[in-house]
């Protein structure tokens, strides 16, 4: 279950890699964990990956001028990170199914 989450830090915080914290935790951490576990998931008879998203993802409004930190709006990063998480789940499910694995995302 990918359910790590950061919601609306008061200021833009970047990871050591320069990734905005909300995106790093809400999207990239679950994505990387799932990729790292893919081999084990593919060997399991009925593996499942659950991504916990948010209803807020239905209203993304991120523009590129908000990505540099000068016009930081935490809510927009939260919304788009959760949308990206849901989109990633759809794509990973397609990839696992196309490869003939029973993993459900």
Predicted regions and their residues:
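Catalytic loop of short-chain dehydrogenase/reductase
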Residues: 5-23, 42-102
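A short, exposed helix-loop element centered on a Lys and neighboring polar residues
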Residues: 34-35, 90
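Ankyrin-repeat alpha-helix packing hotspot
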Residues: 27-28
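A contiguous binding-surface segment within folded domains or other stable secondary-structure elements
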Residues: 105
């Amino acid at each position: 279950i990918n359910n790590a989450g950061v919601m609306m830090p008061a200021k833009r915080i970047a990871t050591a890699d320069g990734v905005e914290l909300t995106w790093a935790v809400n999207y990239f951490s679950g994505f990387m964990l799932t990729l790292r576990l893919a081999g084990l998931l593919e060997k399991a008879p009925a593996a499942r990956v659950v991504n916990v998203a948010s209803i807020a993802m239905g209203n993304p409004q991120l523009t590129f001028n908000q990505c540099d930190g000068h016009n930081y709006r935490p809510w927009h990063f939260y919304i788009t990170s959760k949308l990206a998480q849901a989109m990633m789940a759809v794509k990973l499910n397609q990839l696992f199914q196309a490869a003939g694995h029973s993993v459900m995302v």
